[in-house]
Amino acid sequence: MNQINNMKNTLYSLFLLLLSILPAYASGDKPTIKSLLKELDRTIAMKADFHKQREHEIDSIRKLAHATPSPEEKYHLYSSLYGIYLHYQADSALHYLEKRKALLPSLQNPQYENDLWIARAEVLGIMGLYNEVAAQLEQVRRDQLDNQTLLYYYYTCRTYYGWIADYTRTDERHKYIEKTNAYRDSILSLTTNQLDHSVVLADKMIVEGQADKAIELIDKELAGLDNQESLVYLLYNLSQAYAQKGDTEKQIYYLAQTAIADLKTAKREYISLQKLALLMFEKGDIERAYKYLSCSMEDAVACNARLRSVEVTEFFPIVDKVYKLKIEKEKQISRTLLISVSFLSF
């Protein structure tokens, strides 16, 4: 009973954290870009605190897993640890995947075996091991999957082919885009949750060049939304829709909110902050661009998220060079002013 209560307390803490991520929407007050960027700066400065909170949650679940004699309970607790580590520290997610696998002989549940193949593909994708992702997905027995696991399989396939399409420069890119679109449609055909359906449908609309329709759909969902986790996905989709429309200010507005949410939930594998960094650079805010990219690189390396590391390194050297030139220029101005003041004092 104590173990169950402890688990409830841990989950309740996670729930409270999610509720605190984007309080502006909960209260109905919309923040300004200026206030959001200031909050993002504070959030980056407090990143270590959010990581400590995450480690505390991990430690609580790990203790429960160690204490329970039930293989079934251990399996589900290891699944929770896998989920927490997935976008935080991919190597550790893989470690708890192996612990789940070790329990399979005592559980005798073929559904779990398929679930592990999909989960392994998911984490290997984050680590950038795409050849291995394909090999894992080929092992899945789709005829054995219930609807929930089949949906998980579709999401993983859609993400995998999306990654491949983004980083393929050959004639095969179109083939991967078609596969990405096909799996997105499969998700839409199977999803029963209205909010999840809207998130995926908005993504589809944006891909098909229907930004205005996507914005209209998302705005309807935001009107009465109380699911903070889904809110993050909707806001990111809004940023993409406004990017398609060429509205940079709105893109910054929504990327800032998703970046804050990513950092407050101790995610290290993310895309919003580096996209925001590039926009800051284009607007001439070199200091923020440098800060955001440095944070993104640090987190990607700590998570072992190779794709995100590659994304950052594509334009970090340019930002780094401009930032250092800016600092040097400021030093030169300071030295000139100091000399001038010293001269006038005589």
Regions found by a protein language model. Give the residues of each.
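Alpha-helical transmembrane signal-anchor helices
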Residues: 324-346
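A "functional boundary" signal
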Residues: 4, 12-14, 23-331
